[in-house]
Amino acid sequence: MGITDLEGNPYAVPMNFAYQDGVIYLHSGPEGRKVKMVAKHPQVCITFCEGHELVYMHRQVACSYSMKSRSVICRGKVHFVEDMEEKRRVLDMLMKQYTENECKYAEPAVRNVKIWEVKVEKMSCRSFGLRPSEL
């Protein structure tokens, strides 16, 4: 995720996410550098890439190498979720990506987690080196 730091400079940080109905959800601790930055500059840019595969036309020709890939760039504004039930719903979405186990959350943990909600305002996609059947 790309954000603007307190001095107006670009700042990028990897974060776990979940996506549902045009909204990207992220989570973090309740305070810290990222939270301060987003409170001042709520506009963010989030990018995802998948399917990286090195391909080439000629093994000994460096310029013939490229990377097959798909990517998405999303822009939006961060809103912090405060509702406890909504926080649990988002935490469940995040956890279901990593485990089939049913997860429980301690009340203090839910209260202290910062849930980031980004409604996607703009989205662009790109693929490189993929056949239509691979998209």
Placement of each model-derived feature along the sequence:
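A sequence-composition feature that detects small, non-aromatic residues
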Residues: A12, A18, A39, A62, ...
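Short beta-strand segments
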Residues: M1-P30, I46
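Charged, gly/pro-rich active-site loop segments
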Residues: G51-L135
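A generic structural signal for short beta-strands and their flanking turns/coil linkers
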Residues: V13, Q20-G22, K40-V44, K68-C74, ...
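A broad, low-specificity signal for short, low-complexity segments enriched in glycine/proline
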Residues: T4-P10, K34-P42, R75-E82
